Amino acid sequence: MGRDGRGLRLAGRVLVPAGLALAAGAILVIGTRYTSATVNGGAMDPTYPPGELVLLEKVDAGAIRHGDVVLYRTRNRYEGMAVLQRVIGMGGDRVRQSPGGPVTVNGKPLAEPYVKDGDPSGMAQEYDVVVPEGRLFLLGDHRANANDSRFFLTEQAGSVAATAVQARVPDSRTGLLVPALTALLGLLVAAGGLTAGTVSWVTRRTGRGRRTR
């Protein structure tokens, strides 16, 4: 154990700050890359029902893909509130739909197993638009209850700027798992250092007591 627990004291002095630094760095990564939002309406039901807390990863406009569920905010819709919708069309895509029929993108029907009650149409009228470059055509998964791009067709074909996107739902939580485990490891290292420091202190106190006698 070393004279009067000096080895443990040194371990404590090294491990506590090192562990806390590791945990703080990992938590900073999580805070920088990820956010969350609570679903307020039923537009994304059944995929994300009202009240569900959704984990989101922050992305740049260039990283957005077809099918992504994104959180975006635009000043001229929804009173400036952030909303969650699915990316159907991107710049240059031709998006079409007839009542009761499937959504087609560039002439190909979309397979949409996520839509509410298997209904890809809802109450919307027929539309046929070409998405402007740098913009997105977005729909809710509950087509009969979503106030989405279909209802703003006179505003640049119902699209919103890709730069309005704040975050998207990640494909998996693996990306979050690494920094989360790193943070946990850092806390365990700090706890180990604290334990070593405590044992060292007790050892020194015990040694002094024996010498006093």
Task: Show which residues each predicted segment covers.
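Extended hydrophobic leader/signal-anchor segments used for secretion and membrane insertion
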Residues: 1-213
